Amino acid sequence: MKKILAEIAYDGSLYHGFQIQPTKPTIQGEIEKALEKINKTKVKIQSAGRTDKGVHAKRQIISFYIKININLKNLKTAINSLLKNDIRIIKLKYVSNEFQPRFHAKKRKYTYYILNNENHYPWEEYQAYYVRKKLNINRLNTMAEMLIGLHDFTTFSCIRDQTNSKLKEIYLAKFKKKNKFIVFEIIGSSFLWKMVRSIVGTMIDIEIKNESVDTFIKILKSKNRKYARTTAPAKALFLDRVFYE
């Protein structure tokens, strides 16, 4: 059997996250069903990360074994023909049996889209968080810079997150203006469950209330979940890229 790496994209709006669940539609479940039809036996996929309910991906990485003899171009076409239009295989390639999408990943990049313009089309809110009040991008970036480096992110973790260590290293965190949108980009070693959404929601809350930007670092350093503010909606978050070098 050969091990294959797949780069995939998906709209997570109608799914209960990436990870398979027995009675609910998930990204993993849909892909494994498609692979089983092609492979004529069950296929278990591994992923670089498990996105939450409603979260999307531009370049998620998965791997799986397949026993049938088929070239990658035809395999890609076959898988996509069995998937719904909101999940796509973008690229396939062979990898060594030792490759693990999650454990070999060096960094992950997430992007979060904030719609910050009253003059917008209704559908522009579909995958963005609409904030009516005009946001000060300079203040947001001052808070974002406080994330750079190694920090304990207990404040921005979720009670249900059973990860032993809450220490994560952040390499990049910045807000950029893009037409009607403010886009938050963050690159880190890995992320806790709902961590990015909690960070974004807290920064926006501080900005809307015109509190001192130093409030953010105090909240981060408190290592206490009760001091985090609103958790921003899932619909605006994308797993953008996974780095292996």
Swiss-Prot record:
InterPro entries: PsdUridine_synth_cat_dom_sf, PsdUridine_synth_TruA, PsdUridine_synth_TruA_a/b_dom, PsdUridine_synth_TruA_C, TruA/RsuA/RluB/E/F_N. It is an enzyme of class 5 (isomerase). It catalyses: uridine(38/39/40) in tRNA = pseudouridine(38/39/40) in tRNA. Its EC number is 5.4.99.12. It comes from Borrelia duttonii (strain Ly). The keyword tRNA processing applies. One of its GO terms (biological process) is tRNA pseudouridine synthesis. Belongs to the tRNA pseudouridine synthase TruA family. Pfam families: PseudoU_synth_1. Keywords: Isomerase, tRNA processing. One of its GO terms (molecular function) is RNA binding. The active site is at residue 52. Substrate binds at residue 110. Homodimer. Signal peptide: none annotated. This is tRNA pseudouridine synthase A. NCBIfam families: hisT_truA. Formation of pseudouridine at positions 38, 39 and 40 in the anticodon stem and loop of transfer RNAs.
